[in-house]
Amino acid sequence: MKKTILASSLAVALGVTGYATTADHNQAHASEENIDKAHLADLAQNNPEELNQKPLHAGAYNYNFVLGGNEYTFTSNGQSWSWNYTAAGAQSATSNSVQDVTTQATTNTNETSASEVSAQKQSSNTPVAAVEAPKASSNTQTSAATRTYKVAQTSAASTGGSVKAQFLAAGGTEAMWNSIVMPESSGNPNAVNPAGYRGLGQTKESWGSGSVASQTKGMINYGESRYGSMEAAMTFRASHGWW
C-alpha cells in the first residue's frame, strides 16, 4: 500500500532517541545513529496513525534499516516527511509521504494488486477499486488498482487516547484491528472512499461514522449478525479480501 498524508501540523519526535543531524547534509542514517529500531518498526506495523500525524523530529533525517525480515525507511527534508516498510528484497512497500504540513485535509492513496480487487465483489463494506476484475474470471492480472480515501472535515471524537486505544476500549480486539480495520481504512475513523464507504470498517451503514466507540460497536454487531461471530468475519475477510 502507498498512502499520502496531508497533516495539520509539524510536531516533535515520538519516543525515538538518539537522532542527530550532520553539519554538511543535515541528515542521519540508522546505521550511524543510536535509534530505537524496534520502536519504529512497531509504530509502522501497529500504529501508523502516529507516524502519519507528525515527523519523528524537527529537521531533516534519513533512517533506513532491516529488522524482522522487513526493510524500514523514515525520511524528512524538514518540510515534508515519509516512511515506508516492505519485506526485505520485495518490490512493493507500505509507505507514507506527508507533502504539506500546514493543510487541514488528509488524502490516503492505497495501491493494491488487481488480483486483490477481484476478490472484492458484493460486500457492503468493501472499498470500490478503480479497476475491477471480472467476477467469473480466474486469470491472474498484473495491472495495479488504486483506492483513494479522503478524510471528512468533521472528524470522529478523539478523546480517550489514540484511535486504536479507543477501539480496544470499546470492545474491539487486536485481531479485529489487524485483520479488518488496518486493511480496510488504515486505522482512520474518518476515511471515505469515492464510492461513499466510510469509517474504520468501510461501510455505507450508519455505524460507519461518528465516534470510534460507536463505529467499533457497529462493526461487532455487523460481524456477529452477518457471520455469526467476529472470528468467522475475520476468517472471511482474510480469505476474500472484503467483508
From Swiss-Prot:
Keywords recorded for this protein, A-Z: Glycosidase, Hydrolase, Secreted, Signal
Feature: compositional bias, Polar residues: 117-127
Region (Disordered): 99-143
InterPro entries the record matches: Lysozyme-like_dom_sf (IPR023346)
Main localization category: secreted
Ranges of biased composition (kind: Low complexity): 99-116
Extent of the signal sequence: 1-25
Protein location: Secreted
This enzyme's EC code(s): 3.2.-.-
Enzyme class: hydrolase
GO cellular component: extracellular region
GO MF annotation list: hydrolase activity, acting on glycosyl bonds
Summary of the function given for this chain in its UniProt record: Is able to cleave peptidoglycan.
Entry similarity comment: Belongs to the transglycosylase family. IsaA subfamily.
Name of the protein described by the UniProt record: Probable transglycosylase IsaA
Species of origin: Staphylococcus xylosus
The encoding gene: isaA
